[in-house]
Amino acid sequence: QLWHACGAFKKFGQRGTNMSIAADHAYHVQYNMVTVSSDRIRSIYADAFDIDVHKVKALGCPRTDAFYDEKLMDETKQKVYAAHPEFKDRYVIVYAPTFRDIGDDRTQFKPDLDFDKLSKDLLPNQIFVICPHPVMKNKIVEKSYDNIEVIRDFSTNDMMLVSDLLVTDYSSAIFEYALLRKPIAFYCYDLLNYNRGFYLNYPDDLPGDVYETQQ
């Protein structure tokens, strides 16, 4: 099994706090082998999947391979710029929120953001790019702005390459982004209500500042 996330940030698998989701993940126990990024998190994955730790191998995370391939990274950047020339020569802020277990419909993501204010507060050379989690299906931004966009035609990892700053919350995207040695900020407006649980000492272990309000 190749897991979609690198590292161990928020709790997942059968250790997720939403029991209906945890029940859906009972198939994890069928894995014969799981690959993870390092020895330090083998026990975490074994616990999350309810499998023997000997089935968890620290062989690396394949999705990070692209971040060590300069040619591939350059080609990806050029593809993004070809499709979105407005990103070139701009300070690109990528917002990559994770999905919420709270509520009946995880596909509807409504961040606590005043987009009118955000658009006014951005500097002339800045653009705010929202990269939704694949489970998020709603429009997110109802109005049209020349400095705020929602991107679905490229992956979050693709957008990382053309970004200057990552803004996230509880997403394991931080592990990939750390390889680029670019700044990370955490916008956690629902921290008090977010009860998924963490493997990290939150927020002390985070590689960036945490903000709970847009101000």
Language model feature labels by segment:
Residues 143, 172-215:
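Catalytic binding pocket for nucleotide-activated donors in carbohydrate/polymer assembly enzymes
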Residues 62-142:
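Conserved catalytic-core segment of nucleotide-activated headgroup transferases in glycan assembly
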Residues 5-8, 39-42, 62-65, 98-102, ...:
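Short, solvent-exposed loop/turn segments at secondary-structure junctions
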Residues 29-34, 127-128, 162-165, 208-212:
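Short active-site oxyanion
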Residues 134-175, 180:
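Donor nucleotide-activated moiety binding/catalytic core segment of transferases
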Residues 1-71:
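Active-site and donor-binding regions of nucleotide-sugar-utilizing enzymes
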Residues 31-32, 52-54, 124-126, 181-183:
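A short helix->loop->beta-strand "cap" motif at the edges of active sites that frequently abuts
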Residues 1, 34, 166-167, 184:
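Short, well-ordered beta-strand core segments
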